[in-house]
Design a protein with these regions (language model features):
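N-terminal glycine-/serine-/threonine-rich beta1-alpha1-beta2 phosphate-ribose binding loop
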Residues: 4-113
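Rossmann-fold NAD(P)-binding glycine/threonine-rich loop
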Residues: 104-110, 123-160
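A short hydrophobic/small-residue beta-strand
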Residues: 118-119, 394
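ATP-dependent carboxylate/acyl-activation modules
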Residues: 290-366
Length: 442
């Protein structure tokens, strides 16, 4: 039996060598691009087995082909001519890992018009232009895979478009930025400052040299826009996602959070509210016993609420080239398996404009404030009066003296009962005008 099977496999492999390979055009050779190149080379037999046809890298778009040729240990087909690569008859699938909006969007559009299937991990492009790209791809009869644009190693797009497709998703709550989750986990566990935790993340390769895109919430907002659009089948634009980063969070906040029974995470939240969607990214206090509180390091996790599944959570690594490469190759296999299907029809989901976006003003939730104030009699009464006038009700108050050689200073931490966002923002404006307030820290 083994001899017959081995002979069959050998014959199958021999036949594969006669089959026209699937041509791949790779746009970009940075960290993710290098991961894709290595995987295409190292997993060529596995890809052939999974797809049923061999895969061949026909060209790699870079800015300076000479430099790449000089520094590469193996002979690779580097090119600076994007149009020639994308429109080549030998290329079937374009993998875009350039990052950023331009020139990526123009090149993806060229690929679609040239009847090429596309795999991209570009969160900014998909957040800003995803609806139009999917529509145009359907019109041209090509597929777009974009699993790598959201959850790293979490196959969330596949889950939403296939396994959970019969669910009416009503809410998404997620940790979807590995860099910020690593920073916050480090600050929580070791008491590190924000800058120290960021530096460590950069040293370990979990954060870019310029990490503002991550720490200010933009990266998570792009991902939430994509995730919400797919989950609700309605276009949620990145500009409609409120975002607040983690730069103002200090080690003290983690001490107080633990004292109150919480941990701090950068959450991405979107919910259906009637015919509206409210999407937001901001630091949040999560109860210690909540599943998301256990998601640490570079891991991501995505919670979904659906009418059939009720509740589901997917978790996996969210930073580094490995998880994104895994998602890209998964999309490549999915498209590759369909290339030989008779009468291939594109099955990109169409994202309509069913729901309008809600601003944050009338959001009702609980709040946390940390203040530095002059340590004088009557200060708390003034703060309480301002909050009360704005219909913000106090839940807990912690006050501690802090060292300040210039003058006596106290640190006050306040949590509130559910209050309107606009009421809280008005209260903060009023608090800043009080002469007893030295700083609103977070």
């Amino acid at each position: 039996m083994m001899m017959i099977l081995s002979g069959f496999l050998a014959k199958l492999k021999g036949n594969m060598n006669k089959v026209k390979p699937i041509g791949i055009g790779l746009l970009g050779a940075g960290t993710i691009g290098a991961g894709v190149i290595n995987a295409l080379e190292g997993k060529s037999d596995l890809l052939t087995e999974r797809i049923g046809r061999p895969v061949k890298l026909m060209g790699i778009l870079v800015r300076n082909a000479s430099n790449h040729h000089a520094s590469s240990n193996i002979d690779l087909p580097f090119t600076e001519n994007a149009e020639a690569l994308i429109t080549s008859d030998d290329v079937d699938i374009i993998i875009e890992v350039l990052g950023g909006e331009h020139p990526a969007i123009e090149l993806i559009n060229l690929a679609i018009k040239s009847n090429k299937h596309v795999v991209t991990a570009n969160k900014e492009v998909m957040a800003k232009h995803g609806m139009a790209l999917l529509h145009n791809a359907n019109k041209e009869g090509v597929l777009i895979g974009y699993e790598g644009s959201v959850g790293g190693g979490i196959p969330i797009i596949s889950a939403l478009t296939h396994q959970l497709a019969t669910n009416e998703i009503s809410a998404v709550q997620a940790i979807i930025n590995g860099t910020t989750n690593y920073i916050l986990s480090n600050m929580s566990a070791g008491g590190a400052s924000f800058n120290a935790a960021l530096n460590e993340a950069q040293m370990k390769g979990f954060a870019e040299a310029d990490s503002s895109y991550d720490v200010n919430g933009d990266d998570a907002a792009y991902k939430l826009a994509i995730l919400s659009s797919v989950a609700f089948r309605s276009a949620i634009h990145d500009v409609d996602v409120f975002r607040e980063g983690i730069e103002s969070i200090g080690p003290e906040d983690f001490i107080y959070a633990k004292e109150l029974g919480y941990c701090i995470k950068l959450l991405a939240i979107s919910k259906l509210e009637g015919q509206f969607v409210r999407a937001r990214v901001h630091p949040s206090l999560i109860p210690m016993d909540h599943p998301l509180a256990q998601v640490n390091g570079v891991d991501n996790a995505i919670e979904l609420e659906g009418d059939l599944v009720e509740w589901s959570m997917l978790q996996g690594p969210g930073a580094g080239s490995g998880p994104t490469t895994s998602a890209i190759l998964g999309d490549l296999i999915n498209i590759g398996q369909k290339l030989d299907s008779a009468g291939l029809k594109p099955n990109n989901i169409e994202i309509a404009s069913k729901y309008k976006s809600l601003p944050l003003d009338d959001l009702e939730t609980k709040y946390y404030l940390r203040l530095h104030v002059k340590d004088l009699p009557g200060v708390m009464a003034k703060i309480s009066r301002v909050l009360g006038d704005m219909n913000v009700s106090l839940a807990t108050v912690i006050q501690k003296e802090i060292d300040d050689e210039a003058e006596s200073t106290a640190e006050i931490v306040i949590t509130t009962h559910k209050s309107l966002e606009k009421s809280m923002q008005n209260a903060i404006k009023q608090l800043k005008s009080l002469d007893v307030i030295k700083a609103i820290c977070s």
